[in-house]
Amino acid sequence: MTKLSRKLQTQKRHRRLRRYLIGDATRPRLSVYRSNNHIYAQVIDDSAQTTICSASTVDKELKEKSEKLPSDCNSSSIVGKLLAKRAIKKGIKQVIFDRGGNLYHGRVKALADAAREAGLEF
């Protein structure tokens, strides 16, 4: 029996999670994608198949403040706060958190905690 690579394990977990995580207009899905260098988060209405708002470490607003954000928990918390601010501005207070198959630890946890502190409920 062969062992799956880390990427395949993440994809397998994500497929398993997506069976149950469905966002709608009243409670959209906060989806997180984590790469080696960056973290991306977006609030998605699955019923209309639209992205309501998004934020990432490569966002123009964050690049104006600093030249390059490192791939650490501090950057993830900045992205979480920015995403929560944008979602609340569009009238969204409750979301369903989709960790994207990643373990709820480190950068993903930092983003979630920052979004909660900024006012999102999940």
Curated annotation (Swiss-Prot):
GO terms for molecular function: 5S rRNA binding; structural constituent of ribosome. Keywords: Ribonucleoprotein, Ribosomal protein, RNA-binding, rRNA-binding. Pfam families: Ribosomal_L18p. This is one of the proteins that bind and probably mediate the attachment of the 5S RNA into the large ribosomal subunit, where it forms part of the central protuberance. Gene3D superfamilies: 3.30.420.100. It comes from Prochlorococcus marinus (strain AS9601). This is Large ribosomal subunit protein uL18. One of its GO terms (biological process) is translation. Part of the 50S ribosomal subunit; part of the 5S rRNA/L5/L18/L25 subcomplex. Contacts the 5S and 23S rRNAs. Belongs to the universal ribosomal protein uL18 family. InterPro entries: Ribosomal_uL18_bac-type, Ribosomal_uL18_bac/euk. The keyword Cytoplasm does not apply. It comes from the Bacteria. Coiled coil: none annotated. GO terms for cellular component: cytosolic large ribosomal subunit.
